[in-house]
Amino acid sequence: MMDYTIFGESHGPAVGVLLRDVPPGLPVDEEFICRQLLRRAPQDPLSTARHEPDQVEVLSGVYQGVTTGMPVCLLLRNRDVRSADYDALRHTPRPSHADYTAWVQSGGRNDPRGGGAFSGRLTAPLVAAGALAKSWLKLQDIKVNAQVIDENALRQRAEEARQEG
């Protein structure tokens, strides 16, 4: 079973993921990983002003486009960083963010810029790891599907079915 550790901070040099127990011989399609990363990119100007290119760099565990069985390290450099935007928030935790929790956990030594290690930016390495896992699942002929349903409509259909007997 693959195991992963994400690393980096929102306004540090990079974020990334280290995957262990990746089977040897798994083809690594960097274009597929990039396409998956594009799906998590902001889709409208109101969500965030930050726009990262999200180009994945394979640092280890892959040779000639195939995993070697050693840990796979994927890196995404942070390029669109404006840390000064967070100067005023250094001593003021934002509501609905992990700022205060990070401050308590680190004894006040947390990186407050952009949420640090608790930023949405850390979803990028999770998506990269997921793309690699998805490639492995496909080779095993395992498909994962999901859908969003209207719970009220589902309850109504169930009630109608009960009434019909």
Where are these regions (language model features)?
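Generic N-terminal targeting/processing segments that precede catalytic cores or assembly contacts
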Residues: 1-165
